[in-house]
């Protein structure tokens, strides 16, 4: 079977899974397989174009290719964020292939939209090359934003509201996927339809783009401010805007404040929150890539739901979603599955707000959090979650402030450091604690002996990144302390503090363990 035929076969399997409404284990694992073979992603682009050129293209195959690409891009993004240059280049090559095939006429706009939506789902910027190619394709077909048929747009929005059952956050997510590759002018034209819509759920969804790039957010803010003066900004939107204003730069905050003032003049005030019961609140330990998750089982009225938030060290809040209208057994099954995949611990609303505030400060000012975080925070019953930077020193000091002196004295520190060499044997979560950036290959190049490689990793990779690993360890301790096993999390907090001290890394057994796992990962 040729690689091309193999990709087609996988796509048919995914298509059938999508039609059945349930993804098979094979579909779930396709992303990892494709990410390991970047050339296969270019085949997906080519096959999507070929499907679109058929007399009767199969839209379900487009969805399948989009799913496969999205799964692979998500894996590549994670690796790229960890400094893996191969992953970064693979994503750039996919962008270039899509743009090139669009310009050559091999990839129709509808097929391209299916592929580009994968970038949006994976949390990756589409890029100007694709937007320019999309603009070119639309001009060639006479479908630029000046010629967009309003009835079609109105019908699309009506169908979107129905499919999303009026959920503004789901509407925003789905609409963002549809418009990600569109030129800014066309996006703003379509967003104006949301801002001026009769349906309040569309207007509430529109404020999500105040977290988009400035070219979108700035003119959109002016549109929404004008409608606020007309009483078209709801109380729910005012409540959401008061959260969002804390997550953006000062210039954006001024524009959002202007919307809030205009809405209040005509009587729109923050709505009273509905009673929400948080049945279970869990937090994972931080993995080697810096990822940490929060999960919550909630009840709102008669409905049960699951809230999930993903934090990424150095990148802030990467994702937030809510699965509403689930049964309690379904939620329990999902949480059981999560617990089988990672170490999770009970936590409190106060600690959740604390780590989210830290994550918001940790992200790039140019990359605000996803709009779904507003919904997640609201359903968790949190309020006024604003960016607040927390250093490792301050975090450790806070955690240890109530600990017994005997548990944190010099003797306890040495005991914790010695014990750190055994952590990997007792905590499966730590299997992910290794480096996989380009600096690893450079460090071990020309070194054949394992001990030489380990020494090089410690000296040339882990030493420059000791602050990163101190943060990973400290936030893992923060997660563990909710279980009440003081000795475990206190040991971890003490080792985190040693990581940012002047103590040689060669004296910390955990560091050697991380280096050994890094060497092993580099061999695979």
PLM features: residue spans?
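Non-catalytic terminal/accessory regions
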Residues: 1-205, 214-229, 234-524
């Amino acid at each position: 079977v040729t690689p091309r035929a193999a990709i087609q076969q996988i796509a048919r399997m995914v298509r059938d899974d999508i039609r059945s409404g349930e993804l098979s284990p094979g579909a779930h694992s396709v992303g990892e397989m494709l990410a390991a073979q970047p050339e296969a992603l270019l085949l997906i682009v080519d096959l999507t174009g070929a499907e679109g050129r058929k007399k009767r293209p199969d839209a379900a195959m487009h969805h399948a290719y989009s799913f496969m690409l999205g799964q692979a891009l998500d894996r590549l993004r994670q690796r790229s964020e960890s400094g893996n240059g191969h992953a970064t280049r693979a994503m750039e090559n996919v962008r270039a292939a899509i743009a090139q095939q669009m310009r050559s006429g091999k990839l129709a706009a509808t097929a391209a939209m299916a592929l580009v939506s994968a970038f949006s789902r994976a949390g990756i910027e589409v890029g100007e090359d694709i937007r320019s190619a999309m603009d070119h394709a639309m001009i060639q077909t006479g479908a630029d934003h000046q010629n967009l048929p309003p009835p079609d747009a109105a019908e699309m929005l009506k169908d979107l509201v129905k499919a999303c059952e009026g959920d503004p956050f789901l509407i925003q997510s789905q609409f963002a996927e549809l418009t990600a590759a569109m030129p800014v002018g066309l996006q703003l034209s379509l967003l104006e339809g949301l801002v001026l819509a009769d349906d309040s759920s569309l207007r509430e969804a529109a404020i999500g783009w105040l977290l988009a790039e400035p070219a979108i957010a700035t003119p959109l803010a002016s549109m929404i401010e004008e409608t606020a003066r007309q009483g078209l900004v709801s109380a729910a939107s005012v409540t959401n805007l008061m959260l969002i204003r804390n997550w953006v730069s000062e210039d954006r905050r001024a524009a959002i404040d202007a919307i809030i003032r205009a809405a209040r003049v005509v009587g729109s005030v923050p709505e009273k929150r509905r009673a929400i019961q948080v049945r279970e609140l869990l937090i994972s330990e931080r993995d080697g890539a810096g990822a940490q998750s929060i999960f919550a089982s909630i009840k709102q009225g008669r409905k049960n739901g699951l809230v999930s938030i993903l934090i990424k060290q150095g990148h802030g809040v990467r994702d937030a979603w809510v699965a509403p209208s689930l049964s309690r057994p379904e939620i329990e099954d999902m949480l059981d599955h999560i617990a089988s995949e990672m170490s999770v611990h009970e936590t409190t609303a106060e600690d959740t707000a604390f780590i989210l505030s830290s994550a918001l400060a940790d992200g790039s000012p140019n990359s605000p959090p996803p709009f779904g975080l507003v919904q997640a925070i609201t359903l968790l019953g949190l309020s006024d979650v604003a960016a607040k930077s927390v250093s490792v020193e301050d975090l450790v000091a806070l955690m240890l402030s109530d600990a017994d002196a005997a548990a944190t004295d010099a003797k306890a520190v040495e005991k914790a450091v010695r014990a750190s060499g055994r952590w990997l044997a007792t905590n499966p979560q730590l299997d992910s604690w290794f480096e996989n950036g380009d600096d690893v290959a450079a460090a071990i190049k020309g070194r054949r002996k394992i001990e030489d490689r380990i020494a090089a990793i410690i000296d040339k990779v882990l030493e420059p990144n000791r602050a990163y690993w101190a943060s990973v360890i400290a936030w893992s301790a923060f997660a563990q302390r909710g279980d009440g096993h003081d000795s475990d999390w206190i040991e971890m907090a003490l080792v985190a503090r040693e990581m940012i001290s002047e103590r040689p890394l060669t004296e910390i057994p955990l560091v050697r363990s991380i280096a050994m796992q890094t060497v092993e990962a580099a061999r695979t």
